Swiss-Prot record:
Annotated 5-phospho-alpha-D-ribose 1-diphosphate binding sites: 81, 84-85, 89, 91-94, 109-117, 121
Binding site for Mg(2+) 2: 226-227
The name this protein goes by in its record: Anthranilate phosphoribosyltransferase
Cofactor: Mg(2+)
Residue stretches spanning the membrane: none
Gene for this chain: trpD
Length: 338
């Protein structure tokens, strides 16, 4: 059993934990062996000092070891954001996921209910008629039969129940806000991850490299969006062929018009579901444009498109042919089938 007193004492001095120490500490928390005071002390100690790549890598390895997994194709992708950007935007990554699935790329999407906004991925999918309370086996069937499946985080990470109350009491961001997107239950090796702060763009790409990912974009919009934004440049860290490089992208290079973040303001789950359906039904809007931009990046990650401009063209075809909307209808049917 981990010596929590020693771990907390180490963190209190400003020292960093090794990958193995972090893995053991998080195993203790998620197994229920740590007291709420110990968990709170460790989480805030890490937050105040700043979590390291090794600490995040160790924590993610523990979270992955304890999750309930899903069988998905090796070429499956995930488009996910950390949330916590405070934007209250429409559900960009969820909409983009259907566009990507409509291009023939299997999607294993991981997500949760809203934390900082009115509508998270789980909320809007539920409002669209997709059942989210399904087993891991059922999710795998969705990916196979519908081309897209949604993994509701609480179902796949039952050990999180031991840290949930402490997180609620702390009521501030902790390392756990970063761990969810890095702990996809389908074990995808290809992801586009949006983060709430630019400081995490390069480090999270390094964490995923440490954990064996193959093709990754970690992104943060200049307006604070945890997606690729329409309002200006977006910072990107790309993992490809074992190397990480950082750069910026803009909507201009994808052939899309710019739009202010206010144009992407969302509402509750029902309102966001109506907006998402309108995109999949072909209605032009800034929401369509931002969903296409993020889908394009995911298609680059998947190896389906050579650049954002080609990805946008493929995504537009997915929408306008009805393929993307067809994936939504199929997902609703497969989840309802039990």
């Amino acid at each position: 059993m981990i010596d929590f007193k020693a771990i907390i004492a180490k963190v209190a001095t400003g020292a960093t934990l090794t990958r193995d120490e972090a893995a053991s500490a998080f195993d203790g928390m998620m197994s229920g062996d740590a007291t709420p005071s110990q968990m709170g002390a460790l989480l805030m100690g890490l937050r105040v000092r700043g979590e390291t790549v090794d600490e995040i890598t160790g924590a993610v390895s523990t979270m992955r070891a304890k999750m309930l997994t899903v069988d998905a194709p090796a070429d499956a992708v995930d488009i996910v954001g950390t949330g916590g950007d405070g934007s209250g935007s429409v559900n960009v990554s969820t909409c983009a996921s259907f566009i990507v699935a409509g291009c023939g790329v299997p999607v294993a999407k991981h997500g949760n209910r809203a934390l900082s906004s009115k509508s998270g991925a789980a909320d809007v999918l539920n409002a669209l008629g997709v059942r989210i309370d399904i087993t891991p086996e059922h999710v795998g069937r969705c990916v196979t039969e519908a081309g897209i499946g949604f993994m509701f985080a609480p179902t796949h990470h039952p050990a999180m129940k031991n840290v949930g109350p402490t997180r609620v009491e702390l009521a501030t961001r902790t390392i756990f806000n970063l761990l969810g997107p890095l702990s996809n239950p389908a074990g995808v090796k290809r992801q586009m991850i949006g983060v709430f702060s630019r400081q995490w763009v390069q480090p999270l790409a390094q964490v995923l490299k440490n954990l064996g990912s193959e093709s990754i974009w970690v992104v943060h919009g200049s307006d604070g969006l945890d997606e690729i934004t329409l309002s200006g440049p977006t910072a990107v860290a790309e993992l490809k062929n074992g190397e990480i490089r950082t750069f910026e992208v803009t909507p201009d290079e994808a052939g899309l018009p710019r739009a202010h973040a206010e144009a992407l303001r969302g509402g509750d789950a029902e309102a966001n579901a109506v907006a998402l359906r309108s995109v999949l039904e072909g209605m032009p809007s800034p929401y369509r444009d931002v969903a296409l931009l993020n889908a394009a990046a995911a298609l680059v990650v998947a190896g389906k498109a050579k650049d954002l401009k080609e990805g946008v063209a493929l995504g537009a075809k997915s929408i306008d042919s009805g393929a993307a909307e067809g994936r939504l209808r199929r997902l609703i049917a497969v989840t309802a089938a039990g």
